[in-house]
Amino acid sequence: DIESCDRVGLIQAMPAGDAEKDVFDRRWEQRLELMKEAIIYNRNNPSIIFYESGNRGVSREHMLQMKAIRDEFDPHGGRASGSREMLNINEAEYGGEMLYINKSKKHPMWSMEYHRDEGLRKYWDEQSYPYHKEGDGPLYRGKPAFEYNHNMDTFAASMVERWFEYWQERPGTGKRVSDGGTKIIFSDTNTHHRGEANYRSSGVTDAMRIPKDAFFAHQVMWNGWVSPEKDATYIVGHWNYKPGTIKQTEYVVSTGDEVELFINGKSLGMGERSNQWLFTWKNVPFEAGKIEAVAYTYDKSDKKSKDAKTKKETSRYAIETAGEPHHIKLTSIQNPEGFKADGADMALIQVEVVDKQGRRCPLDNRTIHFNYQGEMEWIGGLATPNEETQKALAAKNQSLVVDKNETAEQKAARKAAD
C-alpha cells in the first residue's frame, strides 16, 4: 500500500498500532517500539507525511515521547508527529477530529475519517429497479440507519455536500483554516460496516473497483489542486425509466456557475445550485432519448461596469437512453505488465450487458451464468450471502469476477451467457 501511494502521489499518515485510546504501561512501550521500527522501515517513502501516535488523542507526555523517536530516527524527513484530536496539546504537530471541521492558524487540522455514509452500487434511486427506498435497511444499535443505506443519487449528492464543508474552510480563506480530511474508504471493503451488506460500502467504487456515481462527482470537484483547475460536468444516474415517469430529483455535479438541463434539445432551465458544485432539478419528466447538462461560467472582466458579466459555455455532459439488451461484453483487466501464467496472477473480468450500439443497459438484472475452460480457478465476485460461485447477478448491469490461473502451460477461456 505504501509503495502504491508513492507511485500515484497519495499522501499518508503512518500509524503505530492503535487501541482507539491512549494506553499505558507495557502496551504504551509496545507502541513506542512499533513506531521506532515503522519509522526506520518506511522513512524513505515520500508519500508518508504524518506519523500517527494513535487513532485517539494521547497525553502530552506520550506525544513528547513519540516526537523524540521521530527526531532520533528521522530528523530530516520533514514529517509531522501528531494524533487524532490533540486540539489542546500544543506539542502535537497536527491534529483533527474524526468527522468534524477543525481549524488552526498553527498546526495542520484534518478529519481522519470524513464521510462515513454507506450505499450499495446496485441501488440507483427510488424509481429504478430494485426500487430501494432511500435509507431503508437494518437498524444500527436499535435505531434507523438512513445514512448507511443510501441510494447512489443521494450518496453522490452527500459526497458533494461533505467535501464542500472542508473546501469552504480551505487554506487561503483566513488565518484559521482546515486542511481537509481523509475519505474513510475509497473502495468498498471488508471492514466495520453499518449498512445492510456484510462489508463497508462507503467507497466511491465498489469492492471490485467499479465506479459509483460518487467517483465521477469527485472527478469534477478534485480536478486540480485545492480548487478545480479544469471545467467538468457530470449527470448523476441513468436515463432509462418507464414511460410517463416523473423523476423526483435530477442531480448534476459541475464546476460551472450555472447549469442548464436539456431533454432531447428542450431546455428545462437552470438548476438550483448548492454546495458549490451541486445543481438540482425537481420533477423532471422522463422522455426517451438524450438528457444533457450544459455548464456556463461568468466572465467578470468587463471593465465597463463592476456588475457586468458575460457567461460562456465551459463544459457539458450527456446520457442517452439505452436500447434493449443485445449482448454481453467481457473486458479483462490485467496486470499493466501483462497476464502472467505463473499460477499466482489474477485477472478481473468486467461483465457488461449492452444494447446494439454498445451502450450499457443500466436496469437489466437477469442472472448471468459463467463457464470457463482451461487451468484456472474461479475466485468469485462481489461478496453476497449467495454462495453459488458459478452465477453472478448483473447488478446495475455491470459486474466483475476474479480468475486465478493455475499453470503456465495452458490458456484459459471464459464465456458468459444469460
Predicted regions and their residues:
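Short, solvent-exposed loop/linker segments at the N-terminal edge
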Residues: 240-245, 337-347
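Beta-strand-rich structural segments
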Residues: 250-253, 294, 345-361
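Short beta-strand segments within Ig-like beta-sandwich modules, predominantly Fibronectin type-III
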Residues: 269-275
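Exposed aromatic-hydrophobic patches
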Residues: 278-284
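Extracellular Ig-like/FN3 beta-sandwich strand-entry sites
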Residues: 286-290, 344-346
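Edge beta-strands of extracellular beta-sandwich domains
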Residues: 302-324
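Short aromatic-acidic-glycine turn motif
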Residues: 327, 371-392
